[in-house]
Amino acid sequence: MTGGNKVGFLKDIKNKVLIYDGSKGFMLQLAGLPAGDSPESFNSSHPEIVFNLHKAYVDAGCDVIQTNTFTGNRIMLEKHGLGDKTVELNRAGAIVAKRAAGENAYVAASIGPTGMLFEPFGKLTFSRAYDIYKEQVLAVADGGTDIINFETFTDILEIKAALLAAKENTELPVICSMAFEKNKRTLMGTEPASCARILKSCGADLVGANCSFGPNHMIDIIAEMAKTGEYLSVKPNAGLPRVENGKTVYDQCAVDFADDLIKYFNLNVRLIGGCCGTTPDYIKELLKRKTLSKYSGDVDARPYLCSQSSSIPVTDIFSIGKVIITDGTDEYDAADDIQEMAYGEKDAIEIVYIGADENRLGDIIARIPGIGKKPLIISSDNDKALINALRTYPGIAGIRSDLKNKYGAVVV
């Protein structure tokens, strides 16, 4: 298997299981990274330490290793006074990982969330998120990474912005991996199957879950994703962390962790490794148990409409609430109408836009909290306004026309 071949990676995940690497942050701290410092700073200041970490995973048998760039977006780096070094540190991270991988492994750029909330709860906008991730993906692509891996995201809208930034500015395969809570939803309330459907509809090559406690908690999440029929990526933690003698340890040893991952192989998982608390020893044990099993569970291939917190098969939509918006519509009145329907008994909400402003429809949808409660059908004779709204909608919307789009919208 040769690194630097995106076609090879996409072919491989269709035919076999690839082994991912494990945690890097914890191992960097053991190697001298001061607590609270930016891990990405080591890409430039201590590249040999980062190289040795990557090489340990390659030597353990990993097919795919990840760059040391998880908190490498500009927002996160600014917390360490390193915002102006965003491009430098990400490019350096890709270069050192490629050097360690050689011809023996693919290199995936690890990219995590900004830690910010979207409007109206925070200050992040879709366009700003897009620009932040565009900067990072271009830097790691310039450094030679083979794959883009967005991981540990909790907001479907943020990872959608990241995904589009990667797809529209590089030709690299993209993995999208979400983190889930104990209730088996993301922090923002999205179900596993909805995550898979939304992200695949926007062009993700592989979807999945990572972090999120340990293997025994994540199995139900992956089982729900498997029902969509998509190939999956999974990277659980080594159980739960605890502090012993002032040090963080995890409650699963390498053998137990690998044993618990055996049941994942028949759930369409094609990329599997570890997250927090795992080391090359965990990967060695996992490699001993690797197998390729055909998924034999039920597959729900029906087209779905998905909001941030609910989904419904198109065939099951019976009642639709309608809100008409024009350029003169008061935004607060529209919000009140949508909020009322969102908490009512309607299956979906149709927003009909009649106007010339290309951005108004998308702006209104982005700023209404209740918009995530019920799936949307978005209608407009203004194609540009409709496209802009679909682009920033955190789900799979319904549309009334055969308008070509790359945002997964379903004709209803």
Question: What do the PLM-derived regions correspond to, one by one?
Answer:
Residues 1-412:
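Domain-level signal for soluble alpha/beta catalytic cores
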